[in-house]
């Protein structure tokens, strides 16, 4: 007597079924994927020759998110922008007045966010409210207590410079060599994750008076009175968002 069992009709049909293939995820385009996102826009601010930055004792404050209205890559296309990243590349060169003395100084560069600029860029002393007795020591400066709701330090970087009482064109005696010093330094920083949102007025220029909320300043101050000039460029990576 055979002990094998006959397959039921539905069992036989089930075993013959071919499993359905799942659609490839590569063929599906997700909403909001990187392919759908607009690429970052780039604005480059160059400072060289007649446009070099002069950094006096007490510092200098410049607006850097200067996105004028337009259709080019460096222009804002809408009434709102988001600045994500910044690259800073400069040569700091001690000026002739500073080179007359043997000196060292610790300078500072800040990126400062201004919630309500009010039509004009502030001075470093407005932001940090330092007394005149601390004018030469920027590493000690802090945002004014009364204005901490307005000014926010996004980044802060230190750098060191030196002078030895000589200028670059001086020539040592034939039997002497002079030790090099940091009268000319290269300063590079790249920072991301800034998330600076700027709301613009209904005007076409990119000055501080065109900003309703969210100005971004680059503040530079020399240490110990070692004044200098800055030669190079700042590159900003941003997007135009919001309404036209």
UniProtKB/Swiss-Prot annotation:
According to its UniProt entry, the protein's GO biological process terms are:
symbiont entry into host cell; viral penetration into host nucleus
- Keywords of the record: Capsid protein, DNA-binding, Host nucleus, T=1 icosahedral capsid protein, Viral penetration into host nucleus, Virion, Virus entry into host cell
InterPro entries linked to this entry: Gemcoat_MSV, GV_A/BR1_coat, Viral_coat
Give any GO molecular function from the UniProt entry.
Answer: DNA binding
Source organism, top-level taxon: Viruses
Subcellular localization, as worded in the UniProt entry: Virion; Host nucleus
Positions of the UniProt region annotated as Disordered: 1-39
* Protein family according to the UniProt entry: Belongs to the geminiviridae capsid protein family.
Quaternary assembly: Homomultimer. Interacts with the movement protein. Binds to single-stranded and double-stranded viral DNA.
Q: What's the protein called, per UniProt?
A: Capsid protein
Q: Which organism is it from?
A: Maize streak virus genotype A (isolate South Africa)
